[in-house]
């Protein structure tokens, strides 16, 4: 009997062992076949997000019954901390949060850097300040797989965002973790709201006001029973041809101000003086038989330059190339977001859009002005024109955009040549401050306009710009100023 029991036990154990081996083998086979397929379909980020969402939902079924009035709110820097671009600011409490902007910036090799990610099930929505890539370039990540996160912004921002994301995907598709389907879902989930309109997202109330930066740009005001947060996004108090000044009177009741600091160390020259200087020097070059290349961002800077030339009835040919025509047509469809739509329409009607290589060849052969992207000469038709025009001392390259470190535009300013392998530039080189960001004095003015301010959080600036501006604010106003790193959480 004992021996029989032993044989039965051993036999049973062997059966269980081989059954387990079979199950493990089957599971391994299924994983080897289906997980790659799922990964291709969702991509790694989406697959992880989907699993995370499922786990979070299960946890939320168990943990519930929060009293919102007892919750502590926080602000977390997911991007834009002591750096320019990659803007991403999370605001919320333990029950959920919203994210203000979700953009990218680029490394030395032009690879996109993405913000930190929050648990997807926790994020109740995104609110977008404007449609520059450093504020919207990462939004589709939260549409991967089963995710359908709502996005809020002005109608102009919505339409321009679609154009910008399509172009980003076309140029950098292999370097980014989403595809066209996620861009499409982003736009399907994008809710347009007007200036002054208030929407509720979970326990927070959100409203938008003109930020004066580009058409559709917004200051974002977030209100709860605990207080008010104002996020400037990119902001400008200077009237330009394209934009009216920011409406900072609408955020005077903020308790916490999250503010950009791109030009925290610098003041901008008088805008009218810049426009006059630019026009006079363009005329000098053209009337001497030369051609002026103006590398400019397709979104806003190109339209600003074209409007300046249109206002003065520039008597020579003007060509514009790149995505600027599509953006211009969008802007003309939303004239309520423009300061001088008449000037932009005049430029659109009278200046020459480059439709192909025949037009491109004609443009650089004529004495006149060419406005072309990209603004930092990192690519686009501007590089073609630069190569054609740079060897002739009669011609000129007039920079009107911010030139980031390690870009060809910055190298031109620092070394006088396009890159380490090029010869010295023979054409005339000038730079003009057509900035659409507030300077040091204006940033201080914004802070002073807020009456019950408890703290200022500086973002979207290099460490030296943030530190310099922080010192000024402390000295002039005496309020607490924080210059956070990415990942830092601030209790409110």
UniProtKB/Swiss-Prot annotation:
Chain residues that bind a divalent metal cation 1: 130, 132, 213, 234
Pfam families: Beta-Casp, Lactamase_B_6, RMMBL
Disulfide bonds: none
Requisite cofactors: Mg(2+)
SMART domains: Beta-Casp, Lactamase_B
Origin organism lineage: Archaea, Thermoproteota, Thermoprotei, Sulfolobales, Sulfolobaceae
Stated family: Belongs to the metallo-beta-lactamase superfamily. RNA-metabolizing metallo-beta-lactamase-like family.
GO molecular function, one term: metal ion binding
Residue numbers binding a divalent metal cation 2: 134-135, 234, 460
Keyword Nuclease: yes
CDD domains linked to this entry: TTHA0252-CPSF-like_MBL-fold
PANTHER family: CLEAVAGE AND POLYADENYLATION SPECIFICITY FACTOR FAMILY MEMBER, MRNA 3-END PROCESSING FACTOR
Gene3D superfamilies per UniProt: 3.40.50.10890, Ribonuclease Z/Hydroxyacylglutathione hydrolase-like
Species of origin: Saccharolobus solfataricus (strain ATCC 35092 / DSM 1617 / JCM 11322 / P2)
The name this protein goes by in its record: RNase aCSPSF2
Keywords: Exonuclease, Hydrolase, Magnesium, Metal-binding, Nuclease, Zinc
Residue runs in coiled coils: none
Cited function: A 5'-3' exoribonuclease, more active on 5'-monophosphorylated and 5'-hydroxylated RNA than 5'-tri-phosphorylated RNA; note there is no evidence for accumulation of 5'-monophosphorylated RNA in this organism. Translation initiation factor 2 subunit gamma but not subunit alpha protects 5'-tri-phosphorylated RNA from degradation by this enzyme.
Cross-referenced InterPro entries: Beta_Casp, MBL, Metallo-B-lactamas, RibonucZ/Hydroxyglut_hydro, RMMBL
């Amino acid at each position: 009997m004992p021996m029989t029991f032993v044989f039965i036990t051993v036999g049973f154990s062997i059966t269980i062992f081989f059954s387990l081996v079979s199950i493990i083998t089957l599971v391994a086979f299924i994983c080897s076949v289906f997980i790659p397929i799922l990964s291709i379909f969702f991509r790694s980020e989406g697959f992880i997000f989907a699993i995370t969402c499922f786990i979070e939902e299960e946890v939320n079924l168990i943990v519930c019954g929060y009293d919102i009035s007892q919750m502590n709110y926080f602000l977390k820097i997911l991007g834009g901390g002591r750096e320019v671009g990659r803007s991403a600011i999370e605001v919320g409490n333990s029950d959920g949060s919203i994210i203000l902007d979700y953009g990218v910036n680029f490394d030395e090799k032009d690879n996109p850097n993405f913000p930190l990610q929050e648990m997807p099930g926790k994020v109740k929505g995104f609110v977008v300040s404007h449609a520059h890539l450093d504020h919207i370039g990462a939004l589709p990540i939260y549409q991967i797989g089963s995710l359908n996160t709502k996005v809020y912004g002005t109608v102009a921002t919505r339409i321009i965002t679609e154009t910008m994301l399509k172009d980003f995907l076309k140029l950098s598709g292999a370097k980014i973790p989403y595809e066209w389907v996620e861009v499409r879902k982003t736009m399907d989930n994008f809710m347009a709201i007007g200036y002054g309109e208030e929407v509720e997202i979970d326990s927070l109330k959100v409203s938008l006001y003109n930020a004066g930066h580009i058409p559709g740009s917004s200051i974002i005001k977030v209100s709860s029973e605990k207080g008010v947060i104002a996020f400037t996004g990119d902001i400008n108090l200077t009237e330009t041809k394209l934009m009216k000044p920011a409406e900072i009177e609408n955020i005077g009741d903020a308790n916490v101000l999250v503010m950009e600091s791109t030009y925290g160390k610098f003041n901008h020259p008088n805008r009218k003086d810049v426009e006059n200087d630019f026009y006079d020097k363009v005329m000098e070059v053209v009337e001497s038989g030369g051609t002026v290349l103006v590398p400019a961002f397709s979104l806003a800077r190109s339209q600003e330059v074209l409007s300046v030339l249109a206002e003065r009835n520039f008597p020579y040919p003007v060509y514009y190339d790149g995505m600027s025509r599509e953006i211009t047509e969008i802007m003309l469809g939303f004239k309520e977001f423009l300061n001088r739509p008449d000037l932009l329409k005049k430029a659109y009607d009278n200046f020459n859009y480059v439709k192909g290589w025949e037009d491109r060849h004609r443009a650089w052969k004529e004495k006149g002005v060419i406005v072309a992207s990209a603004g930092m000469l990192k690519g686009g038709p501007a590089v073609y024109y630069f190569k054609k025009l740079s060897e002739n001392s009669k011609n000129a390259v007039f920079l009107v955009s911010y030139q980031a470190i390690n870009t060809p535009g910055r190298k031109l300013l620092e070394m006088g040549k396009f890159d380490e392998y090029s010869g010295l530039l023979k054409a005339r080189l000038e730079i003009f401050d057509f900035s659409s960001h507030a300077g040091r004095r204006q940033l201080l003015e914004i802070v002073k306009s807020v009456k019950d301010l408890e703290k200022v959080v500086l973002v979207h600036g290099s460490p030296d710009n943030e530190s310099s501006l922080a010192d000024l604010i402390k000295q002039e106003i005496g309020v607490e100023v924080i210059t956070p790193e990415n990942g830092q959480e601030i209790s409110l």
